């Protein structure tokens, strides 16, 4: 019971810290002018909309948040960077779904290259925090809640102990792999932190690349003409290639080196199909 209360205290403290960051904003715009595409508005009638900082839940909220933070970033770059990093680590550390929107926001705010570096770094650090929190507070509770799933994953890890790093890469490369579950169960599976750390850093590069570049592309699109520009089409083609390449490579390697009896032919784990969330 003590471990549960310790985790609750940490979550409450982190939540309060995020609240303070968002409540005491530096001087800047509290509203932005957006174009309403409804029938009652024209392109010459921008509507002023008051926005508040919150985690985006759809693409429209993502675009609005990106516009607001871009205004702040022009004069308060450090604040925006600290706010973004804090929000990202909050989600990753406590296994809260929704990292894809923050990856896209990273691309929109910091550009494709810097956004990718930031996203990969924060994903790795946040997932490692999740690993440490699980090891400190949640091991027995996770085993109690998911006994069959943990046992099956434990068997698969032991079968691939000699190629553990590549096995973890296999699980990370496939987009439907539940990363939150791998993060919280890794201490139970006796996966060393160095192997866990680098499997996250390398294994999620394709996923982060796709999200970050998608965010960068979306932030530059203001009309249909922008979508069909050669530059945008080339970026979308690059994203598609990156999405396909890891799966092809890891499948070829897995046939000879990995034991994947607990996985379906498409690479997804049967034992976790009911809880596939990022």
UniProtKB/Swiss-Prot annotation:
Keyword annotations: Membrane, Signal, Transmembrane, Transmembrane helix
Subcellular location: Membrane
InterPro entries: TM41A/B, VTT_dom
UniProt topology in membrane: Multi-pass membrane protein
Cleaved signal peptide residues: 1-23
One Pfam family, short name: VTT_dom
Top-rank taxon, per record: Eukaryota
GO cellular component, one term: membrane
Main localisation: membrane
Entry's transmembrane regions: 78-98, 101-121, 164-184, 191-211, 230-250
Similarity section: Belongs to the TMEM41 family.
Name by which UniProt lists this protein: Transmembrane protein 41A-B
Organism: Danio rerio (Zebrafish)
């Amino acid at each position: 019971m003590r471990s549960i209360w310790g985790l609750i205290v940490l979550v409450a403290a982190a939540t309060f810290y995020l609240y303070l960051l968002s409540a005491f904003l530096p001087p800047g715009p509290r509203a932005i002018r957006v174009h309403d595409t409804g029938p009652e508005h024209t392109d010459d009638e921008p509507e002023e909309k008051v926005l508040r900082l919150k985690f985006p839940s759809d693409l429209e909220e993502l675009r609005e948040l990106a516009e607001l933070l871009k205004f702040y970033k022009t004069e308060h770059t450090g604040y925006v960077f600290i706010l973004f990093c804090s929000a990202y680590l909050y989600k990753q550390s406590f296994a809260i779904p929704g990292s894809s929107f923050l990856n896209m926001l990273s691309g929109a705010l910091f550009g494709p290259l810097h956004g990718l570096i930031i996203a990969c770094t924060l994903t790795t650090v946040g997932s490692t925090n999740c690993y440490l929190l699980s090891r400190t507070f949640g091991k027995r509770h996770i085993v109690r809640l998911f006994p069959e799933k943990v046992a099956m994953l434990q068997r698969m890890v032991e079968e691939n102990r000699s190629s553990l790093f590549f096995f973890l890469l296999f699980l990370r490369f496939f987009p439907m792999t539940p990363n939150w579950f791998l993060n919280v169960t890794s201490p139970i599976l006796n996966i060393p932190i160095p192997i866990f750390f680098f499997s996250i850093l390398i294994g999620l590069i394709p996923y982060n690349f796709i999200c970050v570049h998608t965010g960068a592309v979306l932030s530059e699109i203001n009309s249909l003409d922008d979508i069909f520009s050669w530059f945008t089409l080339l970026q979308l083609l690059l994203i598609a290639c990156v999405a396909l390449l890891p799966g092809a490579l890891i499948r070829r390697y897995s046939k000879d080196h990995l034991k994947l009896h607990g996985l379906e032919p498409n690479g997804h784990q049967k034992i976790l199909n009911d809880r596939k969330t990022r």
